[in-house]
C-alpha cells in the first residue's frame, strides 16, 4: 500500500481492547491499515478524496473492514448534507461489523452500555452511537459519558436535530461546560456554510465548530491562552479554553467591544494553523473575480476547490458607510479564516475569491489604516502559502453589474483599485502575480484562458 502514511493521531482502541486501532489523519487515500489480531482481517481508514463509487468497491472484499472519513463525504451526497444516520445507513449497512445505535438522553444511563450494547454487538463490532435529546446540558453530559464508555467506538452527531439544536450548538456547549471529548473518532467536523450565518451572534457557532478532532491538528478559533500538547500516547490533551467571542455592536462607538474584538482576532491568529490556499483573486468590486474563479474551478474539476470569500459588503457597505465598522471587519476576517481551515482539509488546489488582502484594503478605505496591521499579521499567518495572486483590473468599456450590494460607481471603484496597487506593490509580499488578471483590456473569457495558461 504505497499511500500509507505515518500516524499522527491515535484514537482509543476498539472496545474491550479487541486490537482494532483507529488512526485519524488527513492525507489522501489510505490513512492507516492494520491487521486484526483475532480474525486476521485488515482495517483500512480512507480519506475523503475518493468518490462514493470507489468507496463502495473497496467495501466489496469480505476480508477488509473499510471506514470512510465523512468530513468531506457529507458534502457529496446528492449535493446535500445528509444526517449522520443516513450516512451510516447508506454506506455502512453492508458491514455487519459496524452497528449504529440512536440513543436518547433519557435512555442513556450506567446500565445502558452493559446490557443494550451486548445485544447490538459481537466482540468485533465497531459501534457508532448517535445521541439525541432536547437539552443541551443532557446531550453534553451524555457525549462526555460516551467518550469514556469502553463499548462505544465512534460518536456521531447529526448536523441538526428535529428540535432545531445543531451540531454547532452541541460543540459550543460541550466546550463551554468542559465536556468536550478528545479520545475517540468523533465525527463532529464541519465548517458552517455562509447561509448558516443569520446574524453576528452566530459567530459563536463558527468559532467553536472549527474545533477539529478528525484531523491531526485540532483547531481552536477565537480562544484565549490555549496551548495544545500531546501526551505519551500521542493523544491531544484536553485544553481548558476560555472563548472570547467577537461581537458586532449596534453602537459603533463602543470602544470596549471593539477593543475586545481586536484582542480576540489577535489571539485567533496565534491559535490556528495555516491553510493550503494556492490561488487568490483580489480586486475592486465588479471586476470579474467571482465569474473568473467559478469558471476556473469548474474547468479544473476535481483538482480544484472554489472557496468564496464572505461578502465584502459585510466589511464595506457603500450605500451606508457608517455600517462599515471595524467590529464587522473583524467578524468577516474570522469567516475567512474558517475558509482557509476548510481548505487545509482537502489538500487540493484552492481558488479563493478574495483573501485577506481585500480585508487590508477595505480596512484602509473605511478606517484610514486603523488596525490594518491586524489584518496584515493575519495575512502572513494564513496566506503565506498562496502561490499566486490574480489582481483583477476593471473591465474595459463594460458596465458593472448592480446586484444591489456591490459598488457601481467607477470613481470609487478606481479609488479602491489604487489601494490594491499600493497594498500589493508597496509590501513585502513574495507572490506570483498572474498576468491573466492584470490586463484590464481582456474580457472575462480571455482572462480565464490566459489565467489557465499561466498556472
Please provide the spans of the model-predicted regions.
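Alpha/beta catalytic cores of nucleotide-metabolism and tRNA/nucleoside-modifying enzymes
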Residues: 1-31, 89, 148, 175-186, ...
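Non-catalytic, usually N-terminal nucleic-acid engagement modules in DNA/RNA processing proteins
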Residues: 1-122, 226, 273
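Eukaryote-skewed repeat-based solenoidal scaffolds used as protein-protein interaction platforms
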Residues: 80-213, 217-222
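P-loop (Walker A) phosphate-binding loop of NTP-binding proteins
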Residues: 284
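Conserved lysine of the Walker
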Residues: 289
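Conserved substrate/cofactor phosphate-moiety recognition/catalytic segment
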Residues: 294, 298-338
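Glycine-rich phosphate-binding loop used to anchor ATP phosphates in small-molecule kinases
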Residues: 328-384
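A glycine- and Lys/Arg-enriched "phosphate-lid" helix/loop adjacent to the NTP-binding pocket
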Residues: 366-422, 429-432, 436-442
